[in-house]
Amino acid sequence: MSIEVNNESAIAADEAKLQRLAGYTFDIMHVHPDAELAILLVDEAAMEQLHVQWMDEPGPTDVLSFPMDELRPGTEDEPSPAGLLGDVVLCPQVAQVQAETTGHTLMDELLLLMTHGILHLLGFDHAEPAEEREMFGIQRDILVGFARYDRQH
């Protein structure tokens, strides 16, 4: 699998941990091992520009996802096809404010946001209550499982 992390923000982040979580998420969601993902960390100005351009919304946001080949989760017997999953763009400055509000670390917030972004790339959404329950449940399960996995490795 190809997971590229590019930090263009002024805030340091554990890029290796972001890559490990992305790989773990690929495994859990049965994404083909040759799938490609780009993770980009940008400052508030760059995120605001993307948010306006692609979502027609003012101000910076925490995470944006840009799907490419519209890959979907696979199964253990039949993983998703290989392809370009897409890009997840994170804004550490916005994430920092959210982390302080919720009482956890910036890195925990970035891990949550990246998982959220990958799930969007895999076709999950949270526009409707049932979709939200499903997506957020999967997101929680991935993060809890990854915390255990990462401690053991």
From Swiss-Prot:
InterPro entries linked: MetalPrtase_cat_dom_sf_prd, YbeY, YbeY_CS
Known cofactor(s): Zn(2+)
Cofactor note as given: Binds 1 zinc ion.
Residue positions binding Zn(2+): H116, H120, H126
Gene Ontology cellular component terms for the protein in this record: cytoplasm
GO molecular function terms noted in the UniProt entry: metalloendopeptidase activity; RNA endonuclease activity; zinc ion binding
The protein's Enzyme Commission number: 3.1.-.-
Keywords from the UniProt entry: Cytoplasm, Endonuclease, Hydrolase, Metal-binding, Nuclease, Ribosome biogenesis, rRNA processing, Zinc
Pfam families xrefs: YbeY (PF02130)
Protein's cellular compartments: Cytoplasm
Record family assignment: Belongs to the endoribonuclease YbeY family.
Protein name (Swiss-Prot/TrEMBL): Endoribonuclease YbeY
Organism: Leifsonia xyli subsp. xyli (strain CTCB07)
